[in-house]
Amino acid sequence: MATYTPMIQQYLDIKAQYPDAFLFFRLGDFYEMFFDDAIKAAQELEITLTSRDGGGEERVPMCGVPYHSAQGYIEQLISKGYKVAICEQVEDPKTAKGVVRREVVQLITPGTVMEGKGLLDKENNYLATVTMFDDGTYGFAYTDLSTGENRITLLASLDDVMNELYAIGTKEIVISSQFPEQYQQLLKERYDVTISYEDETVIPEGFTSIVEALQQDKLKITFGRLLHYIIRTQKRRLDHMQSVQVYQVDHYMKIDLYSKRNLELTETIRSKGRKGSLLWLLDETVTAMGGRLLKQWLDRPLLDRKQIERRLHMVETLIHHYFERQELRERLREVYDVERLAGRVAYGNVNARDLIQLKKSLQQIPALKDIVEKLPDHEAKQLANKLDPCSELVDLLERSIQENPPLSVKEGNIIKDGYNETLDRYRDASRNGKAWIAQLESKERELTGIKSLKIGYNRVFGYYIEVTKPNLHLLPKGRYERKQTLANAERFITQELKEKEALILEAEEKSIELEYELFVDIRERVKQYIPRLQSLAKTISELDVLQSFATVSEERHYVKPQFSDNRELIIQAGRHPVVEKVLGAQTYVPNDCYMNKERELLLITGPNMSGKSTYMRQIALTVIMAQIGCFVPAEKAVLPIFDQVFTRIGAADDLVSGQSTFMVEMLEARNAIVHATQNSLILFDEIGRGTSTYDGMALAQAIIEYIHDHIGAKTLFSTHYHELTDLEQSLAKLKNVHVRAVEENGKVVFLHKIEEGPADQSYGIHVAELAELPASLIQRAKEILAELEQQEQRKEQPSGKNEAVFEQLSMFAEEQPSKEESHLSKKEKKALEALKSVNLLETTPLEALNKLYEIQKLLK
């Protein structure tokens, strides 16, 4: 066994307690890392890997970063999912006997970040915990340490857990060490998160209010696990975590994770970014707090009609009061992130500049209150009453903190004159002492006759009298004590100067010490306001989101939705909000949608790329916007309250779990069929396309019949199986609609307009004509299509309610007999095969043109 130096052994002992974290080990002005940590950190941070003697036979790998710039390096590691343990020297090296005592003062993890670039203004940084109980239920809790927001619930299944995790976008999940391995693997695959472990579940002392709020043992166990993990990693008590909100998922519209992705509510499928999502469109918030709340509202649309209508009424009021809304926006822009400032106060890392930001924010509250109180709306009056100006706190900060304080809280110049008498005396002593020294310099020049004599100061020798060598003979004997000899001068001290120096330096030192003590006292007094600041932040956030809805609704000409009591859905001139913004209102084609108890299932047919998917998405987005309390993109909207939204739109394979497009289709279809109620909204786009024609049609028909007969949910079902349109004859509540397309002078024009009835034909061959494929090939394609249609009619008819023939709305039928192909030349066969292989559902317009160009080249 290797024998290491005491310092390296100390490192190893501490590292053993934090095996899954990088240990930032404080050595003087650096944080050092050793052994495997050093090798890995050097790679991840792109810093130099070196080595040092550790007492053993081989040198120890080592790398380090300066402590004053460590934050940036820590953020890099955290952003990559690592943990960092900060190990500080906890005793003065000058007085230490042997190795300086060191302790880990904080374990920073992806879910416990409190400051820095890792915290985005308009995004929460959630830490979640999942507890699995013997009866198959799950306790689920999450917190944002930077804001003090805590929420908890009980969930019935692992699917519900997955949906909640996706909704909050957590960075880290805390579980029991006994959590099943297969479920841990599932969490890691589905979400790129850090998994951490905590087995202690008893709520610690000091959290009485939380114990009282959590009546069920399951909730106490779940939140206890979360609290213990936070205390263990942060090594401190967090005063802003004294409340928890118990919520029920069935109080909100359920949107499963597949549907949230398909609808691009908070991020786009391709870029995984905000731009192009519904959140991006709706975000006209001007505070960080409002931006975060907007996403929370979008993740959890309401079911309570009264709550929805309260929001809508406030939005309507703000739309009708433009000047008040603009003034409200201007005032809100002056408000800093009060929620996170309160978190920093509780955490103990708030600085004087933070307190000035808090003061400036609170100074806006009276004006905000005045604006909101004047609005003719009951909800506005209630919000105004919640705008707490915290006048005593503003007064404290106004009296105590300098307007432009330094970033450091230990270098003085933080506290205002007049706040503390003792501090004022120290400052007077320091200022007067310096003035006395200036007078002494004049007096010494006069006494000695040396005009070049000067009094200076440095940290090594303190104050001194400097005389050039040619003038040394002019100094009176016995009065000056030599301190330092320079090349051209001598430096002296007098008893009088020595005594004054002691007074000045003592005053400055005591002044800085007292300032820090006063700052800590002020910080502790501010802590008492944390609950009020958190409540105020919540109200400001609500105001910001509501004005954001009003701003977007007015700019985009949205309409206030009404809610029906008979499950009727009427949307006149509805638009897809995001597509309309990108294309422009003049370009976008609006569409109607009408559904009621006799018209519950719309079967949508039409050519590919004609707008079926966009139409379906816009219905869902309209419903969601209405239930978060926003106006909607339509000329008129009367909607039922939907309890759930399910979608199957898009054909991206689940590459992570190795599931095919068809398997993903079936899983998403199952999710809707098992959980949907008659109050749900289902959007199915091209179900069944991932398998053979007959399998696909059979499944599509069976799903339609099941929804129609057993669920009764409002359903939009698009299909390329034209035969399914005959179901209108046998299913009373199914109606056909189609996307209109017309031929003009031999050209196909997609009008993107939804009309009653089924689509009457396919336009695949017309598209091939537009691409200028050889006339002989086009003619042959038409002949083959006609022959195939005749053959299909002779084949086995679909069973049950649908007596239609099998005919696909696609470029060509999928199955073509080899005897037909025998009439073609080799070139034509190759071109036809290439054309058949094009999957229009997964091909962009540009890719299609490139493919057609290749086919043309084959025939030349």
Swiss-Prot record:
Residue runs in coiled coils: none
GO molecular function annotation: ATP binding; ATP-dependent DNA damage sensor activity; damaged DNA binding; mismatched DNA binding
SUPFAM superfamilies attached to this UniProt entry: DNA repair protein MutS, domain I, DNA repair protein MutS, domain II, DNA repair protein MutS, domain III, P-loop containing nucleoside triphosphate hydrolases
Pfam families documented for this protein: MutS_I, MutS_II, MutS_III, MutS_IV, MutS_V
Binding site residues for ATP: G606, P607, N608, M609, S610, G611, K612, S613
Superkingdom, taxonomy of origin: Bacteria
GO cellular component: cytosol
Record GO biological process: mismatch repair
Role: This protein is involved in the repair of mismatches in DNA. It is possible that it carries out the mismatch recognition step. This protein has a weak ATPase activity.
Annotated protein name in UniProt: DNA mismatch repair protein MutS
